[in-house]
Amino acid sequence: MQLALPTTSSPRLTERDYSALTWLVEQKAATTSQVTILLGYLGDGPITDRRGSMIMARWEELGLVERTHVWYRKPAVVTPTFEAARLMGLARWRKPALGTLNHTLHASQIRLQVCRPGSSRGWRTEEQMRAMLPAGARIPDGAIIETDGALTAVEVELTSHGRTRVREAMTSLLAVRAGDGNLFHHVLYLCAPAVVTQVTAVRDELPAAAQARVVVLPCPSL
C-alpha cells in the first residue's frame, strides 16, 4: 500500500513508513536504534542498522524527520518535523526540550518493549491521557492498555524529586476515578537505579490496598 504526502511534489510513503511516523509523532522522539527496531516490528522481521539508516535518510529527504547527535557515543535522536505532525493531522507541533529529551526517549523505550506493534497490549501517550483526564489531574507519562482493557499508568523516574513529590504523584494517580471504579488498576514506576529505593519506600508507606496497586521496577536502558 502506498500513501501520498499532501505536497505538490507528492512524494510517497509505504504503509510501514506511515505507521512508524505515526508512532514517532506520538512519542515525539526516539533513538535511531529504537526506530530501527520499530521498523522491524512493523515489517517482516528485524532489519539491519544500515537498512534502518537508509529509511530514516529518506524521511529526512522528505522533510519529515531530523536526526541529531545529542550525546557522545550514543545513538542519534530522531525527531519528527512539523511536516510529519501535519501529515498525522496535528495543527501544532513542538519538539521535546533538551532537558526532557532523555525522559522522552525512555518512555519510547518502554512503549517499544511493553506494547510492541502487533502485541495484545496497547498504549496511550501522555497527550492522549491529558485529553482523557479532568483538569488538574496528575498526567502519567503513558498508560498501558492491558488485554482486558484495564489501564496501567506508567511513570518514568530517572532523577530524585523528593519523597513528598513522589507521594503526591503516586496517590494522585491511584485516586483517579472512572465511574464507580479506579481508572488505573495499577501504577507502574520504572526507575533509574538511584531512585528505586526512594520510590519503593514511598510505596511501602501506603495502605496495603494501595501498595498492591503500585509496581516498582528498574527502568529499561536505552
Q: How should each PLM-predicted stretch be described?
A:
Residues M1-G89, R94:
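Nuclease-adjacent, charged terminal/linker segments that flank catalytic cores
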Residues P46, A131-A135, A194-V196:
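Acidic-and-aromatic substrate-binding clefts and catalytic sites of carbohydrate-active enzymes
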Residues T68, T100, L112-A153, L158-R165:
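Active-site metal-binding core of divalent-cation-utilizing nuclease and nuclease-like domains
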Residues A91-A107:
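A short, highly charged nucleic-acid-interacting micro-segment common to nuclease
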Residues S108-V114, V176:
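Metal-dependent nuclease catalytic cores in nucleic-acid-processing enzymes
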Residues L158-A208:
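Catalytic cores of nucleic-acid endonucleases
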Residues E205-L222:
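Charged, structured surface patches that assemble and position nucleic-acid processing machinery
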